[in-house]
Amino acid sequence: MEEVRTERKGGSPVPSRILASNEVRARSFGSSGEFMQARELHVRLAKVSKAYDSHVVLADIDLEVRPGEFVVIVGRSGSGKSTLLNLIAGLDFPSSGEIRLLGQSLTELTEEQRAKLRCHSLGFVFQFFNLIPTLTVAENIRLPMALNGIAKNEAKSRTNTLLHDLAMAECGQRFPEELSGGEQQRIAIARAMAHRPAVVLADEPTGNLDLETARDVLELLDQTCRGQGTTLIMATHSREVIGLADRVLTIRDSHLQEAER
């Protein structure tokens, strides 16, 4: 499958540490702009198919995602985008084929091992924010760090940094219901990134937001992942994100293929 790459256009200012991290990330590319082949793939699907009874959702999917890439998967509703993300996360099993996440074959892991891999190495951003209403903003962000055994002082420091970068430094002690939809999604992004996962899976992250807010959230997610060198795989129907992505793929008739720009 031929890769199509574009440069991110426009967007809000990026914190200096994110720019610095992007410079480091850029040096991992070869002179042609392609990722160096020596780097281990973060995600690899080989001939993956998924069917429910007689209904084939995905057929013969081949996909390779390298560290730090931003890959967007588009397609009509019901085309299998969410199913593909669930397979990558090990939340569902393929009918055939192999899925490797961070070099590990998901089918060879126990459920406990898959759960640990998700907890330590994956971050999730969904259409619905799923913030815990009885916890403050700061407590919501710190939750995945607590689950990963990160020291309280370090967790507090990371939380303060994320809130500052989100321009929400004054919101740490507020509760989710006090925030707008766009603000809640920003907090959901911070929570997904707090434990510094290797891969973030985003499923329609702007589905409940107005166009302007959606654009801001997409740019924030892109900047934050690039700043941490995090691989981002996003399923969406939004055309706004195409200019931000390294690659855009589409699911059509159960097959994954290069999307038209």
Feature-to-residue mapping (PLM):
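ABC-family P-loop ATPase nucleotide-binding domain
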Residues: 2-49, 257-261
